[in-house]
Amino acid sequence: TALNAQDIAGPSCAPAFSMSRADFLMIRQLMEEKNENGNRVPELSVEFDADTEVIKDQYTYNIVGKIPGTDSDSMILLSAHYDSYFEGFQDDNAAVAMIIGIVRALLRGGYKPRHTIVVCALAAEEWGISDTKYDWSTGAYRQVFEARPEWQGHVIADLNFELPAHAHSTRDAVRCTYEYADFVRSFVDAVQMPEGIYPE
């Protein structure tokens, strides 16, 4: 976990800082140190030195792979974004690795899908566009409406994965559009949780 300035949904000129867990731990240790009288230091000064620049109208690339289905007219997307702040393991490269792992398991198992399975590693999720609260959707939106307009009307579902390696809770969340709510509830109810999936 880190102090993260992502998705500020504001102007590109707004000052924003991110702090790693390692830096937080160092600052906390300094705050817990005691002076010669045995008292904690009441105040700690920290200097932020940030030089950031948002360069607009740059190119990003979505990476796509397919397993052809017997019904070539319909597709199921497995998607995750690969752009990130700092290392990006949790947000969201773990999800990219996961969808690649899903497809690899299907191929190794000889599975022949009915619907074409499309793997999408998307860019422009963290900051796809300035001055809007929908900056996170730019890469996915442009994939369907600009890069692959022929997909419209053929994608029956997009299973998008975000933060799959989160280890600080005893439950996951599934979100969907209201049209899929009944289906998703029945799907979730049918899933059996393996033992030890949420370690203490």
Which residues does each PLM region occupy?
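Soluble metallo-hydrolase cores and metallopeptidase-like ectodomains found primarily
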Residues: 5-90, 101-111
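Phosphate/oxyanion-binding active-site loops and adjacent basic polyanion-contact surfaces
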Residues: 56-58, 95, 136
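Active/binding-pocket-proximal capping segment
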Residues: 84, 117, 176-180
